């Protein structure tokens, strides 16, 4: 299937989002669609699949002009869209999610062919390297496993074109390798992939070509063998952003945080490590190793069953997030939309949530203090929005992440825990988040950064804590850390 989109325009409430955008993909091609958050990538694909109606321009498929009325019509034609936000119903089984709307039944009885659906689901997932029971509840799976279910659902529609919006954001390196194997197999069979991602290494590894949008406009198209990382970044942001990871200039001094023999039954055991003032401690490991569980215990979401926590040399009890906040510990979770933000609230309201005490006069929330705090934080973190009253659900991924970080900066954290801080964030916003981390450590605070992106771990960390199956696999100094040494420890080696 060959698709060509020409001069596509779209505005929301009079604000242009796409201006004469273009995109073309050939049969069997893996084509990256890149641009900063808010560049119009997802909007362009939603126009292709009938989610949005275009204001202008043409779409031709195999030489015939076409317009889809809705996503179902596009899917029936052979175009599937796997969105960044997972479309998984946690209370349904794996098989029920995969067959939703396409259930197998015994004739017209309405009775489901459950055993057959379970078997097909298991087979499809096994081909993607995921071995789970079709009868298992989807909510019991990790985010990465749920992402693979989404991919399998798209493959089950016999799609000729599969649009993937940040498909690997929650996948481990092994799962990504499995996905790429599947993509390479399908491209040989004539299936095309639109690959929306901010992960440069992946794009240069799996894609044939790149189309770049900036501020809703078409910037250009490049063949992968004929371009470079620097050229793509420059085309995306309209300028050179310099080194990918900013230089670290902080002075590392005394131990600010220590966990001794921390244990949470069924999650992790006998975990011991320290973090020092001015330090960024990277935390690496395979998905399900227990990295996030350890961070949740530090913040009091899931208190330790046994073990000790020390802050500045003093033992403290952290049995709830309130206890953690009193110790000036902040935690930015991996799932900003369900755990880090109230999407229907404004930027101002989200920023105020953990800072009600400092923004109040007496027992009354001060509108003046709230407005000033919002303005200061938006300026400090370069949050791009019309005003502090804009709903966070309407912000790009990068700006949403900045709001999450901003609200916690209000407590002046001495320890900031970041779980997958740049997931789904464009290269420009990533650089800004890295700069915020550096600024905190230069002021003598400490950062723990959990990340599945090994280049990020290596580029930003002073030391790397590697977790393997709920235990400390090892701790690497900066000059010892490499992708190979981290993966060796993460998989149980030495």
Curated annotation (Swiss-Prot):
Residues 3-240, 250-494 form the ABC transporter domain. Signal peptide: none annotated. It catalyses: D-ribose(out) + ATP + H2O = D-ribose(in) + ADP + phosphate + H(+). Its EC number is 7.5.2.7. Keywords: ATP-binding, Cell membrane, Membrane, Nucleotide-binding, Repeat, Sugar transport, Translocase, Transport. It is a peripheral membrane protein. Its main location: membrane. InterPro entries: AAA+_ATPase, ABC_carbohydrate_import_ATPase, ABC_transporter-like_ATP-bd, ABC_transporter-like_CS, P-loop_NTPase. One of its GO terms (molecular function) is ATP binding. ATP binds at residues 35-42. GO terms for cellular component: plasma membrane. It comes from the Bacteria. Pfam families: ABC_tran. It is found in: Cell membrane. The complex is composed of an ATP-binding protein (RbsA), two transmembrane proteins (RbsC) and a solute-binding protein (RbsB). Belongs to the ABC transporter superfamily. Ribose importer (TC 3.A.1.2.1) family. Part of the ABC transporter complex RbsABC involved in ribose import. Responsible for energy coupling to the transport system. This is Ribose import ATP-binding protein RbsA. It comes from Bacillus cereus (strain ZK / E33L). The lineage of its organism: Bacteria, Bacillati, Bacillota, Bacilli, Bacillales.
